[in-house]
Regions:
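N-terminal maturation segment of proteins
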Residues: 1-554
Length: 554
């Protein structure tokens, strides 16, 4: 049965319309037509305009009547979101918005991965979008200059990393030039005149990043902050942003240390199953030398991901989850970038672009270990991000556009994905000791993130008691707690230093999901059904974790 939209739903829908107008990237992400030729504007003026519109809708949401329980949850979620975003703006952090993964320096390029490329019209739009890159870069530089004027700048380490990133994009064989030169409308060639325009636009976008590179190497590097830590006050804001919940930061740090020790002990026990008496490192060596667990090309990786994903959907549907037909298509993709990141992008509103799992393979890497990555497919796909996000988009019967398309909390989303990994182990999908060790390897990394992130940004003492956390200590600590290449570990630690509060949201989010499930189970007593809990929780959409608790437990 479809719920009749309330007055609050209409306000929420109008806010999504305004968000799509203010952010063409958001419009592209959700499949909203009409702005695929535009780019987000990261200039100070655009940021202030976005804040002003946000405040208008904040007031409208606050004044809107509440018709039912769905409205109660919507109102709680939207008010929390508006209030926090205004606090973050007032803190001034937007003037120093530069990190290695989520800032405009990456976002201006990243949206091209999701832009339609299947028609002449799509490439006409992409030509205009690429030609907009220099203007977007200019606006972004002006925003960062405000931070320089205020003496509030990103850490030097983040600037240095972005110099390397910008060098790659600004090179003659950088992303935009290669993207333009390979342009096709699906399998069809484009008209010569359009092709020439596309190549010229690729050059223009490349020149835009050359200007950003010049700024990074000059004024930005000269004025960069020598201090990596964001500090307790701002960290508390970022923690709330990524969790949608207020937590005791010091208690969570101590819990993180305990959780890291617990997962490590569990790893040691599984290592003994793989080879009696083996250390974790020795068990990993056994797995890495097992030819049956090897993939030898990007093509093999893509096909393996797709098979594993399709099998999970088939086995889970109708047994542990009810997976609607549009959700049963998940495309596993090799990304056009080489950062090493594995990520998920949700479907468009009409599912014309399905949910996609992306693997960004570093240059020179052509061998992959299935024991390590089986759990990753479940994390990004089903029952992880794809089931969660695509179900949210699908639930038109109950949720307004904001709840379906725009509401997101890392603690909810990443916490669910880690919860889903453990669930797959509980359901028998990771009974193979190698695959289970891979899951624990990921869980250990996420627990280590809690300790490192809080330790660095709160200025905690090093675990050995010698001074406070710094980059070299963090790099060594992370290297000892993950079984990944030095290049990957280096990227990850740079990420944590520049994106405070995000990395711990995975494990902390999992913790809160499990706490909510256990409280829900206690409340239901003998009537508790885990399948019903998952369905009820996922049908709510991605809420901040405090709001999720309110929605499920009252």
């Amino acid at each position: 049965m479809t719920r009749e939209p309330s007055e609050l739903d209409k306000v929420a829908d109008a806010w999504v319309d305004k968000m799509a107008e203010l952010s063409p990237s958001f419009a592209t992400y959700i499949g909203r037509k009409g702005s695929d030729h535009l780019l987000d504007d990261p200039s100070p003026e655009a940021i202030e305009e976005h804040l002003a519109e946000s405040k208008k809708f904040h007031a409208k949401v606050k004044a809107a009547p509440v018709a039912d329980r769905v409205d109660e949850v919507t109102k709680a979620a939207m008010l929390a979101n508006f209030e926090l975003n205004e606090e973050l703006h007032d803190s001034g952090v937007w003037k120093r918005d530069l990190d290695v993964i989520s800032s405009p320096a990456q976002g201006i390029r990243d949206i091209f991965d999701l832009s339609p490329t299947d028609s002449v019209e799509a490439w006409e739009n992409l030509t205009k979008r690429m030609n907009s890159v220099p203007e977007a870069i200019d606006g972004y530089i002006r925003t960062l200059r405000l931070g320089i004027e205020a003496g509030d700048t990103p850490a030097k380490r983040q600037v240095e990393f972005n110099i390397k990133m910008a060098e790659g994009i600004a090179a003659a064989d950088g992303f935009f030039n290669k993207f333009a030169e390979s342009a096709k409308a699906g399998d069809s060639d484009l008209p010569d005149t359009l092709k020439a325009d596309i190549v010229a636009a690729g050059h223009a976008a490349t020149e835009g990043y050359a200007k950003l590179l010049e700024f990074f190497k000059g004024d930005m590097l000269e004025n960069a902050n020598s201090v990596d830590a964001i500090g307790r006050e701002r960290y508390a804001l970022f923690s709330r942003k990524f969790l949608g919940a207020k937590i005791d930061l010091d208690e969570t740090y101590e819990w993180g240390r305990e959780e890291l020790a617990r997962v490590t002990a569990e790893q040691i026990a599984v290592a003994n199953e793989i080879k009696p008496g083996a250390t974790v490192a020795e068990a990993i060596e056994v797995l890495n030398n097992d030819a049956s667990r090897k993939l030898h090309s990007k093509d093999e990786l893509q096909k393996w991901m797709q098979r594993l994903s399709d099998n999970a959907i088939e086995k889970l549907n109708g047994t542990h989850f009810d997976i609607a037909e549009p959700l049963r298509k998940l495309e596993c993709m090799i990304a056009p970038t080489n950062s090493g990141v594995i990520y998920y992008t949700g479907p468009t509103d009409d599912f014309s672009r399905p949910g996609r799992m992306w693997w960004s393979v570093p240059d020179g890497v052509n061998e992959f270990d299935t024991w390590r990555e089986t759990t990753t497919v479940y994390h990004e796909g089903v029952p992880g991000h794809h089931l969660q996000i695509a179900q949210q988009v699908y639930n038109r019967a109950e949720l307004n556009s904001w709840r379906r398309l725009a509401s997101w909390s890392s603690g909810h989303g990443e916490g669910w994905a880690l919860y889903a990994e453990r669930l797959m182990a509980d359901l028998g999908f990771l009974d193979d000791p190698g695959d289970r060790l891979g899951m624990l390897d990921g869980q250990r990394m996420r627990a280590a993130r809690v300790v490192l992130d809080l330790g660095v940004h709160l200025g905690k003492p090093k675990l050995d008691g010698t001074g406070t956390w710094d980059f070299d200590y963090a790099l060594d600590f992370m290297g000892k707690n993950v079984n990944m290449s030095p290049e990957f570990v280096n990227f990850e630690v740079h990420r944590y230093f520049g994106w405070p509060g995000q990395a711990p949201s995975y494990k902390i989010g999992q913790r809160i999901w499990e706490q909510i499930r256990d409280e829900y189970k206690a409340k239901k007593g003998a009537d508790f059904d885990i399948k019903e809990f998952h369905k009820t929780a996922l049908n709510l959409g991605a809420l901040g974790l405090d709001t999720l608790k309110f929605a499920l437990l009252g």
